[in-house]
């Protein structure tokens, strides 16, 4: 009897999804504390946005878009003397607005479309505070730039990945910046001999005693932001963590440079002669 080619033929055998699901009591495996997960970055993905970037770091996937500059709300303020370099005075400097959201399917448990609440607002504020030192807001008087970060999959170090992707999106949008911002996350293993792990996975974060996110402007060699939580022990322990995070940021910087160069070449090739 001839087969019915109009239908999609499924596999002859199937397995229940529980067979491949991770156990809830799974513990992180031992690994090199200085290793970085493989990173993939691409800028200029969204044609509707002024600038955009997509970043994968291990199992973490983030998409960022930049819009503006547009006139800020309440932007009709008085004028003042111009600052150095043709920038507007401090009272007229532009504003950077950052929004961080998680997709409903980003974690192991599905979230409500408007879920997240205070945690997402806190991460959005941390994103804004780390990006502001790198953006020349004085060149955009009475204007605002909007950065939207969407976490598609949370595989660990979500804030660090969002920071890096947002900086790429700002650069892709042609926003004037002093430097890029590179983010790196760390987690402290519990136990009698705690160790800081660079670029932890979601599982390592869940089993950690403390966490830290470092944001660096690598060319200027200036720290743009720090966000820590948990019990990290002595001050020397946190100092070692910051140093390890800064080294990780410097190692990631060449990947971001190549990403922006490739995006510029694609844009140049697509431009009409």
Swiss-Prot record:
GO cellular component, one term: nucleolus
InterPro entries: ExoRNase_PH_dom1, ExoRNase_PH_dom2_sf, PNPase/RNase_PH_dom_sf, Ribosomal_Su5_D2-typ_SF, RNase_PH
Keyword rRNA processing: yes
GO molecular function, one term: RNA binding
One GO biological process term: RNA catabolic process
Function: Non-catalytic component of the RNA exosome complex which has 3'->5' exoribonuclease activity and participates in a multitude of cellular RNA processing and degradation events. In the nucleus, the RNA exosome complex is involved in proper maturation of stable RNA species such as rRNA, snRNA and snoRNA, in the elimination of RNA processing by-products and non-coding 'pervasive' transcripts, such as antisense RNA species and promoter-upstream transcripts (PROMPTs), and of mRNAs with processing defects, thereby limiting or excluding their export to the cytoplasm.
Name of the protein this chain belongs to: Exosome complex component MTR3
Organism of origin: Mus musculus
Name of the gene: Exosc6
């Amino acid at each position: 009897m001839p087969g019915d080619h109009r239908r999609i033929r499924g596999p002859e055998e199937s397995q229940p999804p529980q067979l491949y699901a991770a156990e809830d009591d799974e513990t992180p495996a031992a690994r090199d504390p200085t290793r970085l997960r493989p990173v993939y970055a691409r800028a200029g993905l969204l044609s509707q946005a002024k600038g955009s970037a997509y970043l994968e770091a291990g199992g973490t996937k983030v998409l960022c878009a930049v819009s503006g500059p547009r006139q800020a709300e309440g932007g009709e303020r008085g004028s003042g003397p111009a600052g150095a370099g043709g920038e507007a005075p401090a009272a007229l400097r532009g504003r950077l607005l950052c929004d961080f959201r998680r997709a409903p399917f980003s974690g192991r448990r599905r979230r409500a479309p408007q879920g997240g609440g205070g945690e997402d607002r806190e991460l959005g504020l941390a994103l804004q505070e780390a990006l502001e030192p790198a953006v020349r807001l004085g060149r955009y008087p009475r204007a605002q730039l909007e950065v939207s970060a969407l976490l598609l999959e949370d595989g660990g170090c979500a804030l660090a990945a969002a920071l890096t992707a947002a900086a790429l999106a700002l650069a892709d949008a042609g926003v004037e910046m002093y430097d890029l911002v590179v983010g790196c996350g760390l987690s402290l293993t519990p136990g009698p001999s705690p160790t800081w792990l660079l670029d932890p996975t979601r599982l390592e974060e869940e089993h950690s005693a403390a966490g830290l996110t470092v944001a660096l402007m690598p060319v200027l060699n200036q720290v743009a932001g720090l966000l820590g939580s948990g019990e990290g022990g002595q001050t020397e322990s946190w100092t070692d963590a910051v140093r390890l995070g800064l080294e990780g940021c410097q190692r990631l910087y060449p990947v971001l440079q190549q990403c922006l160069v490739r995006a510029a070449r694609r844009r140049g090739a697509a431009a009409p002669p």
